[in-house]
Amino acid sequence: MARRFVQLDVFASVPGAGNPLAVVLDAEGLDDAAMQAIARWTRLPETTFVLPAASDEASYRIRIFSPRREVPFAGHPSVGTAHVLLDAGLVAPRRQADGRRLLVQDGIAGKLPLEVAGEGATRTVAVRTPRARVQEIAQPDDARLRGALAGLPLGQLPPVLMDGGRRWWLAELASETALRAATPDWDAIVALAEATDSMG
């Protein structure tokens, strides 16, 4: 069965300049394995799958997949999907009593409001992200972090695992100069992501 999808660059007005995203406009009937296969096929950081809203509160339902797994929330896929659905005329924002126009995205992270301002080329969409929480405080010599932090001059604060719809590690470096000079070990970051069920 043919499926309509759009590939776009979020946060950019020209191709190749923003955050790449694929949006499958009608994902009804696709199972988890099919969605994961499509996300792998696109080879983009994220692919979203749009489904009918499950309640009157929501404008639509969304599932977000990286090439490796489903993720509960991601900012640029949420904003990009809203733009695509608005451009296609598949959703319309609801005007609130205070004049704001909102879409409500329903997904693993819950129902999230997206504020829509303007129209066409001047349209903006802003998402209220899930509140981030500290999941774990680690020691700098934690074996899981050793490869990802190797050679980096750390600051005073310990590394922390955050969860804001997606899990990721944060580590304070000693200075802005250290940050600018850092050369990430991507293989070590991938290993960290796999070992801790995080984005790295």
Residues covered by each model-derived region:
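N-terminal, positively charged, Ser/Thr/Ala/Gly-biased leader segments
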Residues: M1-A17
